[in-house]
Swiss-Prot record:
Topology, Extracellular side: 513-521, 580-583, 662-701, 1463-1485, 1538-1580, 1623-1675, 1730-1741, 1794-1815
Keyword Cell wall biogenesis/degradation in annotation: yes
Entry EC no(s): 2.4.1.34
Locations listed in the record: Cell membrane
Domain of life of the source: Eukaryota
Protein name from the UniProt record: Callose synthase 4
Keyword set, alphabetical order: Cell membrane, Cell shape, Cell wall biogenesis/degradation, Glycosyltransferase, Membrane, Transferase, Transmembrane, Transmembrane helix
Family to which the UniProt record says this protein belongs: Belongs to the glycosyltransferase 48 family.
Transmembrane regions listed in the UniProt entry: 492-512, 522-542, 559-579, 584-604, 641-661, 702-724, 1442-1462, 1486-1506, 1517-1537, 1581-1601, 1602-1622, 1676-1696, 1709-1729, 1742-1762, 1773-1793, 1816-1836
GO biological process terms held by the UniProt record: (1->3)-beta-D-glucan biosynthetic process; cell wall organization; regulation of cell shape
The species this protein was found in: Arabidopsis thaliana
Gene: CALS4
């Protein structure tokens, strides 16, 4: 047997890892990937050319161990293997090698037979020479004719081939030919030059590339390559193309790929800025452009230097040439970009980067100055400049490790016990700490402090002295408590409390006191204010206590001084009030208020206040010391005076309305009379024991009655906010022309104005568009001359691009496409715009009919044509088309002369305006009919019709096959035949919506469009983890209850499915299934209707298409424009106009998808990686960034390895051989950049970390963040350059916007009724809600995608999101917080929209709501919200509160009001007080009832009704609202109220916030009962059960009157119990119920848990996980949990005395004690049974049964005895159950909270048993009514029609009938 060769390794690897015929080069272990993958890729390319060469290339795998060495007999293979992984210790390496060995043994013989030469060496040499002759030489000869990507690929291939050739020759002891060595040397040199590039090909041969010919690019390149004044390190070989960034690399030891990445970044940034500058010297870099970039990049650094008191390191030489100064600026700018590009996780700490940059820039300055110094000394080297990658290892890595170590504590620790990104960053806000850290950074500095555990010390060992100690939390501590709400918004709470006190005083004394006396009493509110101020000062100290050592001295002094001052005023105020005159007390008040007067007065002069706040001048800081903490951020945030006036008036109106309503109508004044009466009633006799026997009045009763009213008082501002914001938002939207074009009829009526509006908005021109109030009241439509000129051509091409996009998306049919397209062919005879056929529909038939009926009445005909411009255009175009058609078809001289004569006569009459009077128009109908037939015959072109055409036309019949003439004949035929049916084109609702919105937006206010060269450049970034890229065929056809996703989509998108079949030319689904290659089209069609990455990428790549078309409009001359962009695109070449358009688009736009796990998916053969690669191949401009984890084995340390992490960017690799494009195996990616990281980058929240990893690969001045569940539209992409201009306009503000908010359209509304509810709710928020937030309130933040960021501003200030674990769970909104705190501003724009998907199933929606509620809970604890609450003025602070955490806190108060009301009423009922007082407490319920229903109606429905009314009409809005109620929207929203309440409270008390992936899929499957129980048990079922028991007891002992508020609570109870099953697909199908019961019994089975058992499989595992958050809760959280659990014992206390044996007889406390004795007996019984079951249940089964029977008989005997003796009655048994059930639950809650104290095996097992019994009983009781309703088929029918639209409901029933046939067909397809 011949010895195996290394070439066989290739096939072996992939036959094992990916079983296909040809090997996959991507499935290589990460430790071998870098060396082996290039060889395998080359082998794939040459596989078909030379099989033996393929075999031999596989030889050079280099990683074969001793077993392969025995076979090969050559030491070289072993040496190479030992060099890489001698012990096969890397992950999957041994498996990789064994598979190779098996393939070697199997395929050696066959490859030897295929060998053409005598030996492997000669075979390889022959192939290499052939490749050189045919590949490399042709490439060299082609020169600039080949692309840079092709050259790069060919040279890389040649290098790999030579490596294989050299290895084979050395094995055979043959020298490589000199000619080959010479060729290889040239190739090797070229290979170093031609590296993969991202956007700019910077190799020497790409000078003629369209981008590289741009003068701005050339100018920037020339500037950065000026290095003649720089001194390189000794030994460095200088190349001609090296630049200042290369010099920085050699001096500071940055990574090569980081330099390459930032080089392109800097070039594009400077070039794009220079494009907007007025050209001075076109071939030189303009200093203005460089200064602009430098100012934006280094603005934060300069501000930081001023704050910490450091002199800036940006120092420039004096009296130097401009080139030298410019070079210095480029060096400073490039240095910052290189630091930022390699900083990894440090990018979240902008001031840390400022610190690093400050010292490195100073070292740069010293190096440059030492070169120019006259003194002779050695130039100074940087501190960290020894080895390669020193910057990473010595600067970035130490800081990163500190971050990583702190992040590890976040898993189980509290926020206060670890430092997050903000804490570590704020360390660099103090010069004191900077001096301690020093430069070079001291390893023993307090910043790097380590715990004993990190140092590896035992508890007994003493920690060594590491310096100044550990710096913990800095400036702020996130303590988990509700008091953060008061601390952050203390001014608001003080205002409410003082207002309430004042109103109560006035109402109480309104009739009994004089005005002066009442005024004096009202002044007592300032005593309360002083107490509240003291409480606030106490909270500041208490909640910041853990940061006392790390906060600066002036902050500590400020806290102490404020506390002392507040304490003094608490003493002085009561004394002054009690012992002095009112006037003296007023003076004291003025003195008390004086420290806060200056900031409030300066509110009216915001420019002065901004200046004072931003100043770092010491005297100014002293003046502002009291009102503003000395922090780096949160200063100068005040808006303009006009903006302040607007939101001030908003809140004055709102608060006035709220307080007046509360006082006069609802809460204060109406309740004073009943309250006085209650207070005057003598103390009633209590049925319960009196704990306070000496109380002489009814204050306790008043507190009980007023408590829910007070809660409503604090909560109802949210309702008033909903009312006022709806009115303001609706008014604002109306003034902005929103919804002016609502229907197709409105679109047709204004369509002729569209070209003018398009020209004014989307075409660069000098005319300024009306803005502001002028535009709001303007009804003038933009019009252009009705000529077929340049403007019309531009509009028609843009319009046709949109319509063609609709057809590609299957929104319209082929016929609708023809009716909607505008004709782009120029007619010399036509001087007007040729409108789309749908606009001219039925105009010709109507005109013919009118002409026939009114023959001779030429004046009427002229008036009709004059009034109807569309009819006039249709008639003129029809005449011109017929004239051209006949002149084209007729060639005979006599016939042509006759036709010419006829048309000449007609033209003469037209010129003289005598056509209608001289010609007989009655024959027009006959002529019309003949022309219709003629066009039909010509279009069909059938032989049998030729006899119907005159002989003269037969001769030239073949001419109709020409495209232009054919299109014109089609148009003429449509003009002649189309009737009224075209008026409803397009019929698809989505197409209608998009067309009407786009048309409407052209009449809205937007900035003028700049030319493409002058627009801001931008990038789009999409974070992706592991969601669906493209639906697989299996996923689409997989059925659940007879319903597949594909079937589901066909039913809810029937018209789009029909259009799809028409597009792929299939009449039926069966024809479609028969064609294999159309399966990919089906996958795409379905994926475009889901929430997939493919849909998002397609939408975002419309930017590329739109920019190319707009660039064509800018660059094309008149002749090229008339030909159209498609003509330019078809003739594209390296020097063509279209190449320039593409180059401009590439310069202006970049799209990066951050596929975090792309490398993992690729190496595991995951289909998602292949689908992503397909996307890159389909869209060559798409880039994918990912985190590459590479395993590296240690050569000298056996069995050990280390993982290294890289930020990588890839694109689709070019193809050098023509292969079948459908073969996915030939699609490869190409690594562009690979930047090493200091460690695993995902140490915080995953999504922001993923964004941070990819942001370094984005380009431009703006960055749009797009989630992977979003979509975009071609028509909206045309408006992007207008939107970007918003960054250059202040729009009445004082600063340029830093975030542009966009409107969103929820495209999942048609999926189900739940999706519709969520769509309407979300739609109102992203439109009218954010409209008001941005203007007038000025508190719009970042609520997720698709906002556009000022990229340069944010990359220097922490990025586009925050990533600290847990606290930044809602990472998006923190970007808005951060931007606002750093003097940015956020605007909102509604003339552009982006599609967005939402969750469509109840469980998905609930998980999303839970995540948002968790995030809001964490926001409540955050420093960002605290600083906004304190640094905003009072009115803006109110806006911030009620639009962020206030909404969730008010939702919590809504539910708490129910609890307080019920427990209070229960107290009144059970104690007998209510009976004594009569009906006086009823007033409280009436008030609460009105409040409850006002909340439901206004809070939920009013914004939705207003926005739908604006956009579609108020009739549709009202209809939608009624329909939503019929589909149980109130049930849905009430249920979600419980979700918000539970998770917000849980987060604030105990934590447990986490990201919850919802899947974003279609929910057509049934959720199991056990799954619903797990998810909703604690959040809804338990609370609903408690409320139900309270209501039941209240109705038993209370009055017969049932109020509206009580009814609403019953509604809430029913909703919380049964909504999950009501909205569960097939929730009432009997067969599903049976399966659910079996699954429930299996899950609830006791003792089926344990370590490693998931919660989905075991009740025990689920229960342990459910209470896990209590183990990490703080002490106060546990105390609060126990305190609230005591309410169940109070409930028991009340019910015990209602037993017939004790009622009205015994009121002693021993009765209550006896009830506890009974509880203990029951618990002991349960414990005995549990113990017996565990001990005796297996081996002593009989004894266990005897014990159970004995206990049962004993209890029955006791029960019968008590009943016989009349000691208890039957109703007493029921009351005992009602009392004991809550008591047991309360004991269980307390036990769970105290788990660490009682976690002894015996005790804890009792607790677990009790919990299991409760879940078993509660779940079983829930299941009974569901099973009962499943008996009735009509309930299931109703549910299906309610959940899904009618078309799907009908299809669902049909599918069940035909399910057997479809399954049979599916199985046949698989076969």
């Amino acid at each position: 047997m011949n010895q195996p060769n290394r070439g066989q390794i290739l096939q072996t690897v992939f036959s094992h890892f990916f079983p296909v015929a040809s090997p996959d080069s991507e499935l290589v272990p990460s430790s071998l990937h870098e060396d082996i993958t290039p060889i395998l890729r080359v082998a794939k390319d040459v596989e078909d050319t030379n099989p033996r060469s393929l075999f031999l290339q596989d030889l050079d795998i280099k990683s074969v161990d001793d077993s392969i060495n025995i076979l090969s007999g050559h030491s070289h293979a072993l040496d190479k293997a030992n060099e890489l992984d001698p012990t096969s210790s890397g992950r999957d390496v041994r498996q990789f090698k064994n598979t190779i060995l098996q393939w070697l043994e199997k395929n050696n013989e066959s490859t030897l037979k295929a060998r053409q030469k005598s030996s492997d060496a000669h075979e390889m040499q022959s192939f290499y020479q052939q490749y050189g002759d045919e590949g490399i030489n042709d490439l060299l000869n082609a020169g600039a004719g080949s692309s840079s990507s092709q050259r790069t690929k060919i040279y890389q291939t040649a290098v790999v081939l030579y490596d294989v050739l050299d290895a084979v020759h050395r094995k055979a002891n043959i020298k490589v030919a000199a000619k080959i060595l010479e060729s290889h040397a040239e190739v090797e040199a070229k290979n170093k030059i031609y590296v993969p590039y991202n956007i700019l090909p910077l190799d020497p041969d790409s000078k003629n590339h369209a981008m590289m010919r741009d003068p701005k690019i050339v100018a920037v390149l020339k500037a950065i390559r000026y290095t003649s004044d720089l001194t390189w390190q000794i030994g460095h070989k200088i190349n001609d193309d090296e630049d200042v960034l290369d010099w920085l690399k050699t001096m500071f030891r940055f990574q090569k790929d980081n330099v390459s990445n930032q080089r392109e970044h800097l070039i594009l940034l400077l070039a794009n800025v220079q494009m907007r500058q007025t050209q001075r010297q076109p071939n030189l870099l303009d200093d203005r452009a460089l200064d602009t970039v430098m100012e934006k990049l280094l603005g934060n650094y300069n501000k930081w230097c001023n704050h910490v008191g450091l002199e800036s390191s940006l120092r420039f030489p004096k009296d130097k040439q401009q080139k030298v100064v410019q070079q210095r600026k480029l060096l400073y700018t490039g240095l910052y970009l290189l630091i930022w590009g390699e900083a990894a996780n440090l990018r979240f700490m902008p001031e840390c980067l400022c610190y690093i940059y400050h010292h490195m820039a100073f070292e740069l300055f010293e190096m440059l100055e030492s070169k120019g110094s006259k003194k002779k000394y050695k130039p100074k080297n940087p501190t960290y400049s020894g080895k390669d990658e020193d910057f990473l290892t010595k600067v970035v890595t130490p800081v990163y490790k500190t971050i990583a170590e702190e992040a590890k504590k976040s898993g189980e620790g509290k926020h206060s016990e670890w430092r997050n990104y903000d804490d570590l960053n704020e360390y660099f806000w103090s010069k004191q700490y900077l001096d301690k850290l020093g430069w070079p950074m001291k390893a023993n500095a307090d910043f790097f402090c380590k715990t004993s555990q990190q140092l590896g010390l035992n508890k007994s060992e003493k920690k060594p002295d590491l310096g100044d100690g550990c710096v913990g939390k800095v400036n702020f501590v996130e303590i988990r408590t509700f008091w953060h709400l008061f601390r952050s918004f203390d001014r608001m709470w003080s205002f409410y409390i003082l207002s309430l006190q004042a109103m109560i005083i006035i109402a109480w004394n309104e009739t009994s006191e004089s005005g002066g006396a009442v005024f004096h009493k009202v002044l007592s509110v300032f005593i309360t204010a002083a107490k509240l101020n003291l409480f606030q000062a106490f909270l500041d100290i208490a909640l910041s206590w853990k940061a006392r050592h790390s906060m600066s001295t002036h902050v500590r002094q400020r806290y102490i001084f404020k506390a002392v001052a507040a304490a003094v005023w608490v003493l002085l105020m009561p004394l002054t009030y009690a012992y002095s005159h009112t006037s003296i007390f007023i003076v004291a008040i003025l003195i008390y208020l004086s420290p806060n007067m200056l900031p409030e007065m300066l509110l009216l002069i915001p420019s002065i206040r901004r200046t004072l706040e931003k100043s770092d001048f010491r005297p100014v800081k002293l003046i502002m010391w009291w009102s503003q903490p000395e922090l780096y951020i949160g200063r100068g945030m005040h808006e303009s005076a006009w903006s302040i006036y607007k939101y001030m008036m908003f809140w004055i109106v709102l608060l006035t309305s709220k307080l007046a309503f509360s006082y006069y109508v609802e809460q204060i004044k109406p309740l004073m009379g009943p309250t006085k009466e209650i207070m005057s009633v003598p103390m009633p006799g209590y049925w319960l024991p009196e704990f306070f026997p000496h109380v002489k009045n009814n204050r306790g009763v008043v507190i009980t009655l007023w408590s829910p009213v007070i809660l409503v008082y604090f909560m109802d501002t949210q309702i008033w906010y909903a009312i006022v914001s709806t009115l303001v938002g609706g008014l604002y939207g109306a003034f902005r022309h929103i919804g002016e074009i609502q229907t197709l009829g409105m679109l047709r009526s204004r369509f002729q104005s569209l070209p003018g509006a398009f020209n004014a908005c989307l075409i660069p021109n000098e005319n300024t568009k009306e803005k502001g109030i002028k535009l709001a009241f303007s009804r003038k439509c933009h019009k252009i001359p009705n000529t077929n000129g340049k403007e019309a051509k531009q509009f028609s091409q843009m319009w046709n691009t949109i319509i063609n996009s609709f057809r590609e998306e299957d929104l319209i049919s082929n016929r609708e496409l023809e009716l909607l397209l505008m004709s782009c062919w120029a007619y010399p005879d036509l001087d007007f715009i040729r409108w789309p056929i749908f606009l001219l529909a039925s105009k010709i038939p109507i005109a013919v009919d009118i002409a026939k009926k009114r023959n001779g009445k030429h004046r009427e005909l002229k008036n009709i044509l004059a009034e109807d411009n569309c009819m006039s255009c249709a008639v003129r175009e029809c005449y011109a088309s017929i004239k051209k058609l006949l002149n084209t078809l007729v060639t005979g001289n006599s016939d042509l002369m006759l036709i010419t004569t006829v048309f000449t006569i007609i033209d003469t009459h037209i010129e003289k305006d005598t056509l209608l009077t001289e010609l007989n128009l009655s024959v027009l109908p006959d002529l019309h009919g003949h022309f219709v037939k003629l066009t039909e015959y010509v279009l069909q072109n059938k032989d049998k019709d030729k006899i119907q055409i005159v002989n003269v036309l037969l001769k030239i019949l073949e001419m109709v096959t020409k495209d232009i003439l054919k299109e014109e004949i089609k148009r003429l035929h449509l003009l002649l035949t189309v009737k009224e049916s075209a008026m409803d084109v397009p019929s698809n609702l989505e197409a209608r919506r998009r067309l009407t919105f786009f048309s409407n937006s052209l009449f809205m206010e937007m900035p003028g469009a700049p030319k493409i060269q002058n627009m801001l450049s931008f990038s789009a970034l999409t974070p992706y983890y592991s969601e669906d890229v493209l639906f697989s065929t299996f996923d689409l056809e997989k059925e659940n209850d007879g319903v597949s996703i594909l079937f589901y989509l066909q039913k809810i998108f029937p018209d789009e499915w029909k259009n799809f079949l028409e597009r792929v030319k299939c009449g039926t689904e069966e024809e479609l299934d028969a064609i294999d290659y159309l399966k990919e089209e089906i996958r795409l069609w379905a994926s475009y209707r889901g929430q997939t990455l493919t849909k998002t990428v397609r939408g975002m790549m419309y930017y590329q298409k739109a920019l190319e078309l707009q660039a064509f409009f800018d660059l094309a001359n008149e002749r090229e424009l008339m030909k159209g962009y498609k003509s330019a695109e078809a003739s594209s070449s390296g020097s063509s106009l279209w190449a320039e358009c593409q180059a401009l688009a590439d310069i202006k736009f970049t799209y990066v998808v951050a596929c975090q796990q792309y490398s993992i998916h690729k190496r595991s053969g995951d289909q998602r990686a292949k689908d992503i690669l397909t996307l890159m191949t389909t869209y060559p401009s798409l880039r994918v960034a990912y985190i590459d984890e590479v395993e590296q084995t240690h050569i000298y340390s056996k069995g050990t390895s280390e993982n290294f992490y890289y930020s990588a960017l890839v694109k689709a690799a070019p193809q050098t051989y023509s292969t079948d494009s459908s073969d996915s195996g030939h699609m490869l990616d190409q690594v562009i950049y690979q930047i090493k990281l200091p460690g695993p980058p995902i140490i915080g929240e995953g999504k922001p970390e993923n964004q941070n990893n990819a942001i370094i690969f984005t380009r431009g001045e703006a960055l749009q963040t797009i989630d992977m569940n979003q979509d975009y539209y071609i028509e909206e992409a045309f408006k992007m350059r207008n939107l970007l201009q918003e960054f250059l306009e202040k729009n009445g503000g004082v600063r340029y916007p830093t975030i542009l908010g966009l409107r969103e359209h929820i495209f999942t509304r048609s999926v189900s009724c739940l999706a519709w509810f969520m769509s309407n709710q979300e739609h109102s928020f992203v439109t009218i809600g954010q409209r008001v937030l941005a203007n007038p309130l000025k508190v719009r933040f970042h609520y997720g995608h698709p906002d556009v960021f000022d990229r340069v501003f944010h990359l220097t200030r922490g990025g586009v999101s925050k990533a600290s674990k847990v606290i930044n769970l809602s990472e998006d909104i923190f970007a808005g917080f951060n931007s606002t705190l750093r003097e940015g501003t956020v605007s909102h724009h509604e003339y552009i929209q982006v599609g967005k998907g939402r969750d469509v199933g109840l469980n998905q929606i609930s998980m999303f709501e839970a995540k948002i509620a968790n995030g809001s809970g964490e926001q409540t604890l955050s420093r960002d919200l605290y600083r906004l609450g304190h640094q905003f003025d009072f009115f803006r602070m109110l806006s911030c509160y009620f639009t962020t955490v206030g909404f969730y806190f008010c939702s919590m108060l809504t539910v708490l009001t129910v609890y307080v009301f019920l427990y209070g009423r229960l107290y009144l009922v059970l104690s007998g007080v209510e009976k004594e007082l009569g009906n006086k407490p009823m007033m409280m319920e009436i008030i609460l009832a009105s409040q409850s229903f006002v909340q439901i109606v206004f809070l939920m429905a009013m914004p939705m009704i207003m926005e739908i009314g604006l956009e579609r009409g108020f009739y549709d809005a009202l209809f939608d609202f009624v329909l939503m109620q019929l589909q149980l929207a109130s049930v849905f929203f009430t249920f979600q109220l419980g979700t918000k309440f539970h998770y917000y409270c849980k987060t604030l008390l105990h934590g447990g916030a986490e990201y919850r992936g919802t899947g974003r899929g279609f929910v057509v499957f049934h959720a199991k009962f056990a799954e619903n129980y797990r998810f909703y048990s604690r959040s809804h079922f338990v609370k609903a059960t408690e409320l139900g028991i309270l209501l039941l007891v209240y109705h038993i002992f209370g009055p017969t009157y049932i109020g509206l508020f009580t009814i609403s609570i019953w509604f809430m109870v029913g909703t919380w119990l049964f909504a999950p099953f009501l909205f569960n697909p097939s929730g009432f199908e009997w067969h599903e119920i049976v399966e659910d019961w079996a699954d429930w019994k299996k899950w609830i089975e006791y003792d089926n848990g344990g370590i490693g058992v998931p919660p989905e499989k075991s009740w025990e595992s689920w229960w342990e996980k459910d209470i896990e958050h209590l183990q990490h809760s703080g002490k106060w959280g546990i105390v609060v949990e126990i305190f609230f659990a005591l309410r169940f014992f109070i409930f028991q206390y009340g019910l015990v005395y209602q037993l017939s044996a004790f009622k009205n007889k015994y009121s002693s406390l021993w009765v209550f004690g006896a009830s506890w004795l009974l509880i203990l007996i029951l618990l002991l019984t349960v414990t005995v049974l549990d113990y017996a079951r565990r001990r005796l249940g297996t081996e002593f089964q009989l004894l266990f049964r005897i014990i159970k029977v004995s206990l049962f008989l004993a209890f029955m005997a006791i029960f019968i005895t008590l009943m016989t003796c009349r000691l208890i009655l039957p109703q007493d048994v029921f009351l005992c159950m009602l009392a004991l059930i809550p008591t047991g639950w309360g004991l269980l809650l307390i036990a769970q909270s105290c788990k660490p104290l009682i976690q002894q095996p015996g005790i804890w097992s009792w607790v677990m048993t009790l919990a299991w019994v409760y879940d078993l009983v509660m779940g079983s009781l829930l299941f009974i009514p569901i099973a009962f309703m499943a008996w009735f088929p009509f309930i299931s029918e109703f549910q299906t029609r309610m959940l899904f639209n009618q078309a799907f409901s009908r299809g669902l029933h049909i599918s069940r009938i035909l399910s057997g046939q479809r399954k049979h067909r599916s199985s046949k397809n698989k076969d």
